[in-house]
């Protein structure tokens, strides 16, 4: 299911994806947004981040940073 979701978001215009993510985060679903972002192409995430609200982009950036730090510790 999630691979299908990421495929949909990878094909979506970045502004539309960002609008949906902003809405989802506003509804308290930031973990769901983060899970989707982890499965997207990096170039698409970059474009989507440009359109997210500043607070949401900041939170997701911190989550990505923490995820990468934890991933490096495991490797």
Regions found by a protein language model. Give the residues of each.
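Hydrophobic packing positions in regular secondary-structure scaffolds
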Residues: 1-75
């Amino acid at each position: 299911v999630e691979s299908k979701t990421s495929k949909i978001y990878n094909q979506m215009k970045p502004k539309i994806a960002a609008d949906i993510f902003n809405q989802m985060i506003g509804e308290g679903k930031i973990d769901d947004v983060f899970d989707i972002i982890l499965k997207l192409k990096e170039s698409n995430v970059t474009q989507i981040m440009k359109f997210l609200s500043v607070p949401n982009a900041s939170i997701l950036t911190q989550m990505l940073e923490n995820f990468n730090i934890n991933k490096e510790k495991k490797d």
